[in-house]
């Protein structure tokens, strides 16, 4: 993991002779540019600025924060589809040996889950969209009051797209849900069918966990084991509860 180093620079706020002759903030420069400077406090005589530079100080590495939101949504959607449909098929298989019943239950889980994920993501991201639009309008009004209408307006940042988020979430859920359906939905004997669903789900869970960790800069082995154990627990719980329900009723 790249090491992040911060340095605090005290810069006088008194007028300088000219912008061209004013020295840059003290700190390491790379390719003629100073590291990112963020003002964290302003006093009467000086401003305190925090200089954050991950690459100029030799840290290097890749910044994963920009893709964190979409990566999280994709991994969660695929895992939800995989575990939900696999657990549903195994639970139905616990009370019925019919291959058709398992297949129909899996397809129903795929459709219902994809719609639920898409609607939930749409509502969540649209709420975030409304909040960011309202905050941007407040900033523009405050800026116009400070500058008496003479200052330049802030450009609008990149706002989240509710439709793209909903489509991505539904697609990720569908991809995950198709794996147990294709693995065991068309196998006729009961025992091989359940074994195929469990094997395909286990392999996919480990793969999704390792892939998400690798793209996010974490440990693939630890993430794969964590996701795999969680999937096994969900499938075992679904099988046990439905088996108990079938024996009681």
UniProtKB/Swiss-Prot annotation:
Catalysed reactions, semicolon-separated = Fe(2+)(in) = Fe(2+)(out)
Compositional bias per record (Pro residues), positions renumbered to this chain: 16-26
Any GO MF annotation of the entry:
manganese ion transmembrane transporter activity
Residues on the Cytoplasmic side? 1-74, 124-166, 215-226
* Keyword match Zinc: no
Q: Which Pfam families match?
A: VIT1 (PF01988)
Query: InterPro entries attached here?
Result: Ccc1_fam
Role played: Probable vacuolar iron transporter that may be involved in the regulation of iron distribution throughout the plant.
Name of the protein in question: Vacuolar iron transporter homolog 3
Q: In the record, what lineage is assigned to the organism producing the protein? A: Eukaryota, Viridiplantae, Streptophyta, Embryophyta, Tracheophyta
